[in-house]
Curated annotation (Swiss-Prot):
Keywords: Cilium biogenesis/degradation, Coiled coil, Cytoplasm, Cytoskeleton, Repeat, WD repeat
Pfam families reported for this sequence: WD40
PROSITE patterns associated with the record: WD_REPEATS_1, WD_REPEATS_2, WD_REPEATS_REGION
UniProt WD repeat ranges: 16-55, 58-97, 100-139, 142-181, 184-223, 226-265, 268-307
Protein name: POC1 centriolar protein homolog B
Family named by the database record: Belongs to the WD repeat POC1 family.
GO biological process terms on file: cell projection organization; centriole replication
Record-linked InterPro entries: G-protein_beta_WD-40_rep, WD40/YVTN_repeat-like_dom_sf, WD40_repeat_CS, WD40_repeat_dom_sf, WD40_rpt, WDR55_POC1
PANTHER family linked: POC1 CENTRIOLAR PROTEIN HOMOLOG B, WD REPEAT-CONTAINING PROTEIN 55
Length: 470
């Protein structure tokens, strides 16, 4: 399979944090990227050329996680200051604060319908919250040590969590009970997530391993030993065929789950890589590290069928149709080591001037007075009530800061009506599909021509062999 792939390539290089980047997450439309940092700030990076990045101070200690809501109109962040903040990702940077736990909050994650989010904490608990009312719902408390990560399944019926008690647990949110426990006696996991079909979970271990478990059969399917240090984060490609991993060894690795092997090793960061994430379309992925940098990569591999596979996966997230997975092969547990050859990519040798990718940064905390919590709650609630609706308008953005030259801002709608804007976006998507279809046809035509050439060459050899035999 690797021979048909194209190598990933570094696209963007964002530098604005003053300390380690702890988490990265793409907006649902792929036009923005959120990052959290140990510098106690959240940043929103815009992919539109010559646009500004937004920097949101507000947390009192390191921010551990950040995530867009399914609609993309809210961003949630968790912090060592024991709080969770909900931000409107615009130039005003309004936020509401939830005093979520009695210890460090490690993770925050939205359900696919956008109605609920969960938090994981060093107080050994997982808590669920109603997003619209910003109220506590329930706790899951069977872990006996710090909870590092908690994630919803794609259909929202299950939660996967990992803890320093060396277990990965699967929870049924209807009954609020732990229905499955995977134990790893060699060390705890730093991160856990469901595959796009919701039938497997992958864990990133401090023992430098990556494990894929089948939650239907309660068996370990795949066990990868490809990193030289602890694994901090992982992300499934939307197709479910590839897994992205980040490690303290300073590398990002890409695993082919169908063939059960490592295919790419990416060198771009100067220090441990703490977070990785695929975009919702799968055509990009991002990484954040202790070097305070955010790198955005072009996927390139599996480019011919990304869109169709993603569409099929999205159709199978409906709770009325329980998923059936055949995308993890082989079905027997076995160890995968780094003994096989992977393609090493070091973009820093090819990208001499990475600073040109750094956008201007608006420090929201410096430019605008901090909004009182009551006002922020009122503003956010206006959007949270409609968080599952994708097309409501954002509030008007403030003008540029005094003394600075005015620049266009990403996310600001021009004079175009919403319906016309949506129509144009659909046309662009259709053109992209047509372009991709043409690429596929060209690829198939090339293969056909090669086969035909081979047949003609073999046909010419037949008379020669016949005369030799006579």
């Amino acid at each position: 399979m690797a021979s048909a792939l194209e190598d990933p390539a570094l696209q963007r290089h964002f530098k604005g944090h003053k300390d380690a980047v702890t988490y990265v997450d793409f907006s649902p439309d792929g036009k923005q990227l959120a990052s959290s940092s140990a510098d106690a700030c959240v940043m929103i990076w815009n992919f539109k050329p010559q646009s500004r990045a937004y920097k949101y101070p507000g947390h009192k200690e390191a921010v551990t996680c950040v995530q867009f809501s399914p609609s993309g109109h809210l961003v949630a962040s968790s912090s060592k200051d024991r709080t969770v903040r909900l931000w409107a990702p615009n130039i005003k940077g309004e936020s509401s604060v939830l005093k979520a736990h009695t210890a460090v909050v490690r993770c925050v994650n939205f359900s696919s319908d956008g109605h609920t989010f969960i938090t994981a904490s060093d107080d050994k608990s997982i808590k669920a919250w109603n997003l619209h009312r910003q109220r506590f719902l329930y706790s899951l408390t069977e872990h006996t040590n710090w909870v590092r990560c908690a994630r919803f399944s794609p259909d929202g019926r299950l939660i996967a969590s990992c803890s320093d008690d060396k277990t990965v647990r699967i929870w049924d949110i209807t009954n609020r009970l732990c229905i499955n426990t995977f134990v790893d006696y060699k060390g705890h996991s730093n991160y856990v997530d469901f595959n796009p079909m919701g039938t497997c979970v992958a864990s990133a271990g401090v023992d430098s391993t990556v494990k894929v478990w089948d939650i239907r059969t309660n068996k370990l399917l795949q066990h990868y030993q490809v990193h030289n240090a602890g694994v901090n984060s992982l992300s499934f490609h939307p197709s479910g065929n590839y897994l992205l991993t980040a490690s303290n060894d300073g590398t990002v690795k890409i695993l082919d789950l169908l063939e059960g092997r490592l295919i790419y090793t990416l060198h771009g960061h100067q220090g441990p890589v703490l977070s990785v994430a695929f975009s919702k379309s799968g055509d990009q992925f991002a990484s954040g590290a202790t070097d305070a940098q955010v790198l955005v990569w072009k996927t390139n591999f599996d480019k011919y069928n990304i869109k169709e596979i993603v569409k099929l996966q999205q159709k199978r997230t409906c709770p009325e149709a329980p998923p059936h997975l055949n995308d993890i092969y082989p079905k027997t547990p076995h160890l995968h080591t780094s003994s096989g050859h992977s393609i090493e990519i070091n973009p820093m040798f090819e990208l001499a001037d990475t600073q040109t990718f750094d956008p201007p940064i608006i420090d929201v905390g410096a430019n605008f007075p901090y909004c009182r919590q009551t006002k922020a709650l009122h503003t956010l609630n206006k959007y949270e009530r409609n968080d599952n609706v994708c097309n409501y308008p954002m509030p008007p953005l403030a003008s540029s800061v005094e003394g600075q030259k005015e620049h266009p801002l990403v996310g600001v709608q021009g004079a175009l009506p919403r319906s016309l804007s949506n129509t144009l976006e659909q046309i662009v998507d259709q053109l992209n599909v047509l372009t991709q279809t043409v690429s596929i046809l060209e690829h198939r035509l090339t293969l056909t021509e090669d086969k035909l050439k081979e047949c003609l060459e073999n046909q010419q050899k037949i008379p020669a062999h016949a005369s030799e035999s006579d």
